[in-house]
Amino acid sequence: MNIVLLIYCLAMVVAHDLQLFGDFKFELSDNWRNDCAKKALEPIINQCAEGIETISPFQQKSIAIQLSICEFENAEISYPSECRSQNLDTCILLLEKSPQYWTTFSGYYREIRNICHQVSLPFAKDQILQVYGNITEFYRTLMDEMTNSSKYTENMQNELKAKFDKLIGVIDLILADREKNREDLKSSFNMFKNNFEKSLNNALVVMKHSYEDANSNVKELESHLNYFINDMSQVYILINEKALEVKSQQDRIKEHNADILNQIEEIKKNLDNAYEEASEVQISNNQLVHDIQSSLDYSLFTVSNLNSHLQLSINDFIEKNEDIRSRAPIIFEEIFGLFLNHLNESGQLAMDSFEAALDLSLNMLHQKLNQTERSIDNLNSKVSDLAHFADSLKKYASSIFNVPNYVRTSMNHKIQQWREFGNIMVVGGVFFFVVLTLLVLSFIRTQVMKVFRFAFIGIPMITGIALAIFILRLLSMPMKVVDID
């Protein structure tokens, strides 16, 4: 702004000086422009300014003739008409015939260089004055334009000031209106916040009760599994005791029947193989129990994943609550609907994951039961083969070696015990397979929540009944001790 004002003041001063300078009149310059000699010397004025040595002899003769003509015309003396046609050679010949003409021509011819030097200074002055006059006119025009621009700028400033005053008034009205709307919006938002917090608290209470119910169901399932594991451990201990008792009786028979050791060596090997098969079956049962435990652990892990999904849903809901607080209350119904959909999707996802995990566990259990059933069938077939082999061997030994009656009685008793043990294993496996099949069919045909209730209550009850029947049958087996003394 300061620079603009400085330029404006400088232009004013220069314009004033030029206006004063334009009042002067240069009469000498006007006379010079109208002089015949000036017109004659115009072709060489520029050369005179650069240097007189640049003037050629032809130019010197032409300028001398033109100056002579000017002098003749000023003195009103007639001269040859050929000199007007710019025929220099003819004109010079005609001027040579008259002493007066020749003296004038020769004088100008000799003084051309001096005249050129004298005339160049007024001509330069005239050029300077002309340029300065043009500059004066330019600055005068510029001054007028700047004056008009200053007036236009002042008018624009006044108009802008009036418009800004009106705009400031409108802005004040808008701000007052917005302040009033802000108070109304604040009260509406507080009301929305209170209602939303109440709804959120109710939803959290419902989710907490659901989580507690699921936790109680998991604990009940854990107690039933512990009961099932304890029963299986007792069965395993009884089987080991029976196996040890059988082995001790075999050792006593071996000690008191040294005479028939070679004949029953093959029977002993077969009994050892049968014992190994029973051990393998026991190991397979233990592996089955371990797989069941793993499946149950996986189910617990799935339940924990369900809990984590619910927790993530709660966290996501809290984040959305923070986002909702910054919005208008008109979107409350849409947000609540989206929240319910999200909870339903999360619950459905968790239920699908739990169903998939339970299906996988049941499939694995079904495979293990099939393997156990095949092992029991193999063991039953081997026990049957062993029984037939023992019967044939007994007959052969009785007919050849006349085996004592107490030995035959002991052998028959042991064979009968192994046969009954194999039958019990087969019946128990078939019963367990039937129960599992019914459970799978009920799981397919009923709703998921009903199956869960049946699984929490029915499976442990059926398993306990089956184990009780198995243990009663095992304990009811006749275990006679043969006195061989």
UniProtKB/Swiss-Prot annotation:
Main location, first listed in the record: endoplasmic reticulum
Membrane side Cytoplasmic: residue ranges: 445-450
Record-annotated membrane-spanning stretches: 424-444, 451-471
Signal peptide (from-to): 1-15
Protein name: Nuclear fusion protein KAR5
Family according to the record: Belongs to the KAR5 family.
Gene (UniProt): KAR5
Topology Lumenal: residue spans: 16-423, 472-485
Species of provenance: Candida albicans (strain SC5314 / ATCC MYA-2876)
Location relative to the cell: Endoplasmic reticulum membrane; Nucleus membrane
